[in-house]
């Protein structure tokens, strides 16, 4: 199950969508990050077993992950 949250604190007022509770596999995280960035048309990064995307993209990310068969919370 993947979980989503939105963060602003400590980011200069910028909004970031964080996908966490993902499998601890660097190749998987990199591939998922690329996929989500393409699907949402935004930038992002992989950091400490999470995928961070620029902007409040929770709805788009939730829809994309659910289409791939993931259970999503948040």
Would you name each region that the model predicts?
Residues 1-47, 59-74:
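Long, charged, low-complexity intrinsically disordered regions
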Residues 50-55:
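A generic structural motif
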């Amino acid at each position: 199950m993947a979980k989503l949250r939105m963060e602003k604190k400590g980011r200069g007022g910028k909004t970031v969508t964080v996908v966490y509770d993902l499998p601890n596999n660097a190749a998987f995280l990199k591939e998922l990050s690329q996929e989500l960035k393409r699907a949402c048309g935004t930038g992002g990064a992989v950091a400490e077993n999470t995928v961070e995307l620029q902007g409040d993209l929770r709805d788009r990310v939730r829809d994309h992950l659910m289409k791939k068969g993931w259970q999503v919370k948040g």
